Design a protein with these regions (language model features):
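Glycine-rich, histidine-containing beta strand-loop boundary motifs that form or position
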Residues: 25, 33-36, 44, 67, ...
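N-terminal small/glycine-rich loop or linker at the start of catalytic domains
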Residues: 81-98, 195-208
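Structural beta-strand/beta-sheet cores of well-ordered domains, especially the beta-sheet scaffolds
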Residues: 17-19, 28-30, 52, 59-62, ...
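Aromatic- and carboxylate-enriched substrate-binding clefts and catalytic-loop regions
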Residues: 121-252
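An acidic, carboxylate-rich microenvironment
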Residues: 73, 106-107, 150, 215
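Short, acidic/polar
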Residues: 103-118, 216-226
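Catalytic and substrate-binding clefts that recognize carbohydrates or anionic sugar/phosphate headgroups
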Residues: 1-89, 99-100, 105, 112-117
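Catalytic domains of carbohydrate-active enzymes, especially glycoside hydrolases
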Residues: 17, 81, 107-130, 151, ...
Length: 252
């Protein structure tokens, strides 16, 4: 499982993100893609220098062996399986500024002013979790970023695109429409007994939308319109490995 922990040393078995594609080169070059959402152990020459051992904790998985004479051929075949990338808009190729975190609009303005004074072109500024109301997805803190739609438009006139973060965990809070819809419709990941799995990330206790389900992807995806209607035209999808700080019942 993934772990949102910056200290990834030899004693840390969990990576920050899971990418279940590996390309091996030796007497034969080939790729392996494992289509499985749960725990996988990768031992790449660690126990035995010339051996790779992959251990999958489960039975319901697919393994793709991708043959090819050159790495580029293998990568192209892999992308055919998972889907090719879309072509980003031109402005997305410009210089982008991000950090954790800009606490209010004034902090963003100061960064933009700094770039202008230094004569450095800037196209995008990323908004981390502090733009949200108590770290709730698809909300804006009106005290920190008042008149957000107008602010987005003002920055656009300055040539700056604002890219807000969206986390995979939906805050458990009565009256919060995103959470209420997810709970009512059974959109969150479940425990073995059918109850909602609950874990902790930035907002506290959250539910995790089950993105393996097309109906959940469609539901969650429709919520981005809340921000696109305010002029936002790019997003930073984060914590979607999923990252988790702790769980209520513990992880087995």
């Amino acid at each position: 499982f993934c772990s949102d922990d910056p200290f990834h040393t030899e004693t840390k078995s969990s990576l920050y993100a899971a990418h279940n594609f590996l390309m091996l080169s030796g007497s034969k070059t080939f790729g392996i893609f494992i289509d499985f959402p749960s725990k996988i152990r990768w031992d790449i020459g660690y126990t035995t220098a010339n051996k790779t051992v992959i251990t999958i904790d489960g039975t319901n998985f697919d393994i793709y062996y991708i043959d090819g004479t050159k790495p580029l051929e293998i990568v192209k075949e892999f992308r055919k399986s998972i889907g090719t990338s879309y072509v980003p808009p031109f402005w997305a190729f410009g210089y982008q500024q991000s950090r954790w975190s800009y606490h209010n609009a004034e902090a963003v303005d100061a960064v933009v002013d700094g770039y202008n004074k230094a004569g450095i072109p800037l196209d995008c500024v990323y908004l981390d979790i502090d733009y949200m109301e108590r770290y709730k997805d698809f909300t804006v803190d009106d005290e920190k970023f008042p008149n957000f739609k107008d602010y987005v438009s003002k920055k656009r006139e300055e040539g700056i695109h604002l890219i807000p973060i969206i986390d995979a965990g939906v805050k458990k809070e009565n009256g919060y429409d995103i959470y209420e819809e997810g709970r009512k419709n059974g959109y969150f990941c479940k425990n073995e007994d059918g109850t909602d799995f609950e874990g902790g990330v930035w907002p506290g206790i959250v539910g995790f939308p089950d993105f393996l389900r097309p109906d959940v992807r469609k539901w969650f995806g429709s919520k981005y319109k809340i921000l696109t209607d305010m002029g936002i035209d790019g997003f930073w999808n984060d914590m979607n490995e999923p990252a988790i700080f702790y769980s209520v019942k513990g992880l087995n």
